[in-house]
């Protein structure tokens, strides 16, 4: 077990902003977090994180995964001060961090989100891992076995898709063609990703994805996404985080307030 205080970090806000599609929610502020071939249980009480790992694993794996090198208090403050209409977003999403995840997994997720929306994309990501990834079990200190799955590599995914007898679905067809291109045609995910992938994986924080935020930006800022992308925030990190502040707000509107103030 490793315990650390992390200000401006909130597990529930990160989960609800759809940044990390395959976290397993046990209850509010308690998650199984999967990364590559590792998984840990993390609980949060206020700013305290109780992590089911040793100190070495925290600094070698999870410190980078959670983007803890970045001062998110400064990121939040810069967004909040830029425009009064950002204040509600900044207050409600102040614990959101960008998460450093697997390249292939994020490429698939970004494409699914672009075509199907975040809710459906998260559901399908779980199904892909369950059907084609390596199955693992761990109690995580709960007393009960919890099953989780590694995200499959392109090699593993293509091998299992080729062994299936049914004709498949459009999603399976996309996955098969993508794996073949990566393995046999020198296909570069870095050069062919959409704006969401560029933000999630490449950390091209000058990008501002339009997935599911067009209507909200038009309504609240009286402009289209292309104009909104030109906002001159102090740092690129702020621009990337702002997208997830907006997405978090849309997906989880407070009961007492249905629009920005």
Regions found by a protein language model. Give the residues of each.
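HhH-family (HhH-GPD) DNA N-glycosylase catalytic core used in base-excision repair
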Residues: 1-261
């Amino acid at each position: 077990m490793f315990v650390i205080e992390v200000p401006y970090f909130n597990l529930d806000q990160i989960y609800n902003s759809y940044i990390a599609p395959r976290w397993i929610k046990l209850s509010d502020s308690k998650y199984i977090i999967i990364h590559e071939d590792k998984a840990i249980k993390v609980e949060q009480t206020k700013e305290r994180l109780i992590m089911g790992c040793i100190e070495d694993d925290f600094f070698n794996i999870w410190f980078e995964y959670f983007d803890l090198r970045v001062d998110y208090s400064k990121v939040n403050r810069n967004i909040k001060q830029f425009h009064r209409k950002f204040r509600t977003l900044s207050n409600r999403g102040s614990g959101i961090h960008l998460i450093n995840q697997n390249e292939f997994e994020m490429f698939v997720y970004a494409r699914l989100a672009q075509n199907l929306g975040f809710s459906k994309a998260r559901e399908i990501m779980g199904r892909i891992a369950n059907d084609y990834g390596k199955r693992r079990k761990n109690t995580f200190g709960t007393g009960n076995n919890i099953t989780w799955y590694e995200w499959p590599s392109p090699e593993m995914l293509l091998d299992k898709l080729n062994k299936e007898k049914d004709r498949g679905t459009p999603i399976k067809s996309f996955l098969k063609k993508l794996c073949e291109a990566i393995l046999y045609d020198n296909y570069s995910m870095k050069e062919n990703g959409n704006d969401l992938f560029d933000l999630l994986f490449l950390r091209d924080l000058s990008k501002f994805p339009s997935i599911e935020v067009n209507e909200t930006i038009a309504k609240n800022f009286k402009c289209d996404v292309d104009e909104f992308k030109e906002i001159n925030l102090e740092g690129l990190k702020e621009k990337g985080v702002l997208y997830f502040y907006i997405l978090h707000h849309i997906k989880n509107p407070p009961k007492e307030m249905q629009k920005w103030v």
